[in-house]
Amino acid sequence: MRFVLSLVSALTILTFARLTLAETVQIEFTDQDSYSIEVAKIDVGDTVVWLPTNKGHNVEFLAGPKLNTLSRKSEIDAFHSVVFKHPGVYLYQCTPHGNMGMLGLIIVGEDFHNLESIKKIELSRVSASVLKRLIRIAQSRTNSL
């Protein structure tokens, strides 16, 4: 019985420690029609905050696991915050500048299980080229860990 109580206590402490260690990544809208961090690698439970440091931009998710649990699109020039609860790759764009390549990737939990479906998304020629570059960056960061 003591072992079970010790185990439950240890798991509770680890869970609480993980919750308190969740990080926040801040991404700014730049004046060059891009995001200040184009590929963010985070853990499950971390938060990404997009800051409207330049006007005319937003965040619109195009793909990712369980998108129905996220706010799919922010207002233009608005602060936006998302807690990522599901591992996988998330692709987002700026709605007004998406066709010009203003894209970003969030890799949650080093999980690439849905990458092939993201590669198949129809994008403009410029955006498709940007996405290929972002995927190379994401994969090179994972391979170097």
Regions found by a protein language model. Name each.
Residues 1-5:
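Positively charged n-region of N-terminal signal peptides that target proteins for export
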Residues 6-15:
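Bacterial N-terminal signal peptides
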Residues 19-145:
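Extracytoplasmic copper-binding redox domains, predominantly the cupredoxin/blue-copper superfamily
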